[in-house]
């Protein structure tokens, strides 16, 4: 039997997930949608030829007996409300990042899930489902390069819109590294410093770009992440792990190598959706499969909380350009 899904939010990522769950993935059926713009929700249903009902709001959708699991892809500040409602209804919920817009909101979700007594929440961090990151983690975990000592990373976008602000380099961009690097290293952060190199002439007046984020983990690993969102040349994700006895590097996406016009070249992707489309498919299929098996897995509410705590420290460090300490409370045994 297909898992009956309700989707809250039919913007770009919501529409893409609805398409994915109704046309690409196995054992799922989108039976309910809603959005703050109900006309947009109805248009998505019509465009994708869904046999789905448009609900007046997220709470009506969550509490519908037709809905077995919920996808939250709405405006970020609404996420906490709908995730808490799904937990209260006892329904599994996949929530796109951010889990909540504050660390306190994430902690409320953690507390609600622990009180319920069963994992219901998966957070939409997709990089742990990327083949390249999985291969990199396998090398680290094997001990082939010894203990990781340093990581050199970069997150580069060709351009960003006028509404992109300096702190969004953390909350919208670096947040993916904050999650995936914890997962790669099985380690937590203890401090961060943000420094600003010479500003790019391609950056808008209100935006400080690029930025360099310097992280330290509890085990002493040092991480530098270059965030450069106006690099012009493409969407480029880099991660190099320097170990005691070797170096492991995130593989580049598979592209045709071209020999032409006295040049040897490889194309660089321009869009994040193209770079991680496979990871999005694997991520949501894993959610569907785990719900059908009776136990939600993947990035947890605790992972969402940990990322939010780190992001708050990074934003503080942006303002001071000094080293900012951070720490997490003890992880509930509930999360393993």
Swiss-Prot record:
The keyword Oxidoreductase is annotated on this UniProt entry: yes
InterPro entries reported for this sequence: Gfo-Idh-MocA_inositol_DH, Gfo/Idh/MocA-like_OxRdtase_C, Gfo/Idh/MocA-like_OxRdtase_N, MI/DCI_dehydrogenase, NAD(P)-bd_dom_sf
Keywords: NAD, Oxidoreductase
GO biological process: inositol catabolic process
Pfam families cross-referenced by the UniProt entry: GFO_IDH_MocA, GFO_IDH_MocA_C
Keyword check for NAD: yes
UniProt-listed Enzyme Commission number(s): 1.1.1.18
Catalytic activity: myo-inositol + NAD(+) = scyllo-inosose + NADH + H(+)
GO molecular function: inositol 2-dehydrogenase (NAD+) activity; nucleotide binding
Protein family (similarity comment): Belongs to the Gfo/Idh/MocA family.
Described purpose of this protein according to its UniProt entry: Involved in the oxidation of myo-inositol (MI) to 2-keto-myo-inositol (2KMI or 2-inosose).
Assembly, per entry: Homotetramer.
The protein's name in its UniProt record: Inositol 2-dehydrogenase
